[in-house]
Amino acid sequence: KKEMNRLNSLEDTVNKNQMLFGIDQGAIYADIRIDHAKRISELDLDGYAVGGLAVGETHEEMYYILDETVPHLPRKKPTYLMGVGTPANILEGVDRGIDFFDCVYPSRNGRHGHVYTNQGKINLFNQKYEKDMRPIEEGCQCPACRRYSRAYIRHLLKAKEMLGMRLCVLHNLYFYNTMMEEIRDALDAGNFRSYKEEKLYNMGQIDREKEMSGQKKFH
């Protein structure tokens, strides 16, 4: 109700150079979500967002609500998933019709020494990286990987040097942007599903035995 009141109150007051999105709400209740999606779709807005799925819900609940809700939003308008998420969340969101996302994960995790790679997330505070002279990820062209080793970045983090956090954030943002480029290329090529499965498998998001039996397990 609050969202509908907000949208109705904005008629003729919106800057024409900006886009107005309706936000689908309803927690994890599919019937409420679907009803609200239909109501905001009637307003013919610039785009539509799915909100309220990054405040404690499980990944399984998020994917269920997307499965139930997104089909009731206009297919020809951009769809935005708010406050999400991990690389796996983004891949699963795109597979369910989401076009774009916003999230603090890359920067927040980077500030704590957690960095993303194509083989999964690593914590540079772990002692095993103390003498690791490899870059965060082999072949990565981000500023951190081109010039610094895991060992040196870990030293910066342990010494509470701001550069350590900045390098981790730079790497994570580069990783996310590169993944989004790969997603767009896979969609254009018509092989997104196979790309997603391979990406999740390489990042350790799919259990090998479950995959072999046709069942997926997300962590």
Please state what every model-predicted region is.
Residues 1-2, 16, 38, 76-77, ...:
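Context-gated lysine
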Residues 2, 43, 68-71, 155, ...:
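Residue-level signal for well-ordered alpha-helical scaffold segments within enzymatic catalytic domains
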Residues 2-7, 35:
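Acidic/glycine-rich phosphate/pyrophosphate-binding loops and surrounding catalytic core
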Residues 6-9, 13, 119, 189, ...:
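Short linear motifs in intrinsically disordered/low-complexity regions
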Residues 10, 15-136:
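Glycine-rich phosphate/ribose-binding loops and adjacent secondary-structure elements
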Residues 137-219:
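C-terminal extensions of enzymes
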